[in-house]
């Protein structure tokens, strides 16, 4: 069994809420790692001190949307000025919030003053960019969105560098937002990731003993980081790319919970923390509603040589083991640092003595079902091509699909859609057949690598829901055989989640 090397890199990614609510705890975790013989590389998400909608990234997206509105109404300068005043106010709020945090947490006056100047300069740069876009009527596209959103991670890094320096830990600000050479490609290709990892590693190694504090936002990504297949959650991916570039074997994802749970503990009080989970299970949970780890981060971590172990840990309980993402039987485990997992030091429940059961149950809200009855006597490949082309034109992806001879049902995520999009899609698909739209739905998913070996588990799941009079609109079982999903009314989602967890997890563990 291999032991962990002293002075080896460990990549520590801290979520926006952790940095927003517990910056002192974050700094102490990094300091402890360094004093303990590790070489921490710190990835920062944009700060958020409460709900995500009020976080820095959400505010910056407000700036982006406001700027788009300004550029779109060049014929109305009075309205432009009104909107620009609103935009300027949002940026001022961001700046004031960041500076107030510096004043609270940084003890040394010289570091406070320097960090305040840096934050003010960053916010002025953002304001100057938006002013130039307004003046010269620039194209406010995905690249522009990336540029504006990247300031959130920059500001977080300014704070964390100051927090570490305030504790006599030498630290260096590392901006990855525009470090990858722009190859003018419009589409993200697989070779982008190893190239980016190499560039990241080279830049971070240049810190020469100082703790690198790294922007979780990275670029330039072909097309756009936000609007490409990466999207929100990119800082997880950044952490894994940094680990690959540094040949690190450990990534720690720090959150405000003990690890990954059998269900969302905010909705299911008796949910248990899992000591370990496979990458496939983690990816399914992420896709179907649980904010676990970005799916591309999981994929790249397992493909790395040696594979990278990912720990999900609680920033408020740094001594806890948390949940480790370990490879399944089909993965190459020859170089996996398995000795890092010590169940005796874990807040998470050991599953070694438990009967065979699913791994977790999750819910994904803001789902709309499209039921389409073909106006032909039988389906054809042309029908599906037309339907999916219409969805693609509106940037709509399908979460679940169920088909019969002349009928297709699709569950789509409508969280970022306005009613006009649904109406437009409805009208266009109606040319191909009869369309019925069911809003306010939710996907309920049972996830587990052992599901394929659990005879009758699907029947038991649906029987539990039926006994409690929960109507099922759609049923789907993934080709991977580790997920069984159904679509139910959103009003029944929390009740159904608790019923399934109680019957399949709590009672099973007694």
Swiss-Prot record:
InterPro entries xref list: AceGlu_kinase-like_sf, ACT-like_dom_sf, ACT_Aspartokinase, ACT_dom, Asp/Glu/Uridylate_kinase, Asp_kin_monofn, Asp_kinase, Aspartate_kinase_CS
Q: What stretches pass through the bilayer?
A: none
Cellular component, GO annotation: cytosol
Pathway info: Mycotoxin biosynthesis
Q: Tell me how this protein is used.
A: Fusaric acid is phytotoxic to plants such as cotton and banana. It has been shown to induce programmed cell death in plants. In addition to a mild toxicity to animals, fusaric acid exhibits acanthamoebicidal, antioomycete, and antimycobacterial activities.
**Which EC class, in a word?**
transferase
Task: Work out whether the entry's keyword set contains Electron transport.
Answer: no
Using the record's annotation, list all stretches that form the ACT domain.
372-440, 446-510
Reactions catalysed, as given in the entry: L-aspartate + ATP = 4-phospho-L-aspartate + ADP
Keyword Zinc found: no
- What keywords would UniProt list here? ATP-binding, Kinase, Nucleotide-binding, Phosphoprotein, Repeat, Transferase
EC number, UniProt record: 2.7.2.4
Q: Name one GO molecular function term.
A: ATP binding
Any single biological process term in GO: lysine biosynthetic process via diaminopimelate
The annotated phenotype of a deletion mutant is: Strongly reduces production of fusaric acid.
Q: What triggers or suppresses the expression of this protein? A: Expression is positively regulated by the fusaric acid cluster specific transcription factor FUB10. Expression is also positively regulated by the secondary metabolism regulator LAE1.
What domain of life is recorded for the organism?
Answer: Eukaryota
Instruction: Give the family this protein belongs to, as stated in its UniProt record.
Output: Belongs to the aspartokinase family.
Function description: Aspartate kinase; part of the gene cluster that mediates the biosynthesis of fusaric acid, a mycotoxin with low to moderate toxicity to animals and humans, but with high phytotoxic properties. L-aspartate is suggested as fusaric acid amino acid precursor that is activated and further processed to O-acetyl-L-homoserine by cluster enzymes aspartate kinase FUB3 and homoserine O-acetyltransferase FUB5, as well as enzymes of the primary metabolism.
| Identification of the protein by name | Aspartate kinase FUB3
- The organism is Gibberella moniliformis (strain M3125 / FGSC 7600)
Query: Lineage in the entry?
Result: Eukaryota, Fungi, Dikarya, Ascomycota, Pezizomycotina
